[in-house]
């Protein structure tokens, strides 16, 4: 229920529980949308920068909304939704997001010279270390791998998500010159740690 409240910004969801002696009512409303969702997921962590990066875009009837931030954590937290339905196994929207994120973040780290100075090869896992992301797409006629809708398989979604993320993240990098340097240092550090662990 909380996920739905975050995904539908400013919509109040009311849950009435009359089972006990004292009836309970819970009202959920979040004005910040998925950006507030990322902050909620990252409570207790130290973000690399604030507020989270957020992007909205659409193409061919498919709308994409994403919010993401990196923290001092070493784990990736990725939540994907299609028409407010969660996909625990990701799918084409996740594939498009990861491709764009890896290309943009690692491209910046390479072009800034940080990766070359440290002499490390960057991977997608390095770019996603410490990442918390909520990705929500609205698709007119989505196709899923099963009735449980755990994985989106609509092939037209991948290039749309890839394009939106590439454009918006690239634009964010240009408008915020300090944050990409901090992020690149974290990515290179993750790559160096991965290489050291492999050699050990």
Label each region the model flagged.
Residues 2-200:
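GHKL-family ATPase ATP-binding module
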